[in-house]
Amino acid sequence: MKKILCLVVLGMICLVMLAAAPEEKMPKPQYDEKGQLLRPTDYREWMFLSAGFGMNYSPEPGSHEMFTNVFVQRWAYDEFAKSGKWPEQSMFVIDEREAASRSSINQKGHYQTDLMGLAVEVKDSSRNPDKWAYYGFAADSKSSGAMAHGNSCWACHDAHAAVEHTFVQFYPTLKTVAKQFGTYNEEREKVADAK
């Protein structure tokens, strides 16, 4: 009888400990009552994939230089590492920051300054018939509607991204993974005329 009582007490202690354990943080897309994507919070604590400088889709120089920093949720990154595929509800946040070069003790180079805006890419086939949707946030926006079907972001990613709608060819830590799983499209590295 004592043995049974000890097992019951031990079982209850385990249940209490499980209930008190902090919930694992797995950020997923959140939407408001209008169906607009809420601005992802704490995205700078996610997995950093890559940064670009001076990324411009035009052959002409832009009016300003900026950095683009790409982040994805840790759980989505881990899933990709196991399969070479992005799971549903993966979110990529492109943090767009102004570049500066004159306020540093360094004589050359650039560094990041103020946030200009965010671009967010979401894989969610329950909301998007094309699986992927694109959202743009001004520096202070709290929510954003999806860009129209067939928008220029969607079309470019569809035509040039190496894995699904993502530019894994520019994410050195994931390119090898995608190649190992056979999900990498080698042809997408040829971007001589990516219009």
Place the predicted regions along the sequence by residue:
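Sequence context surrounding c-type heme c attachment/ligation sites in exported
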Residues: 23-32, 39-47, 51-56, 83-195
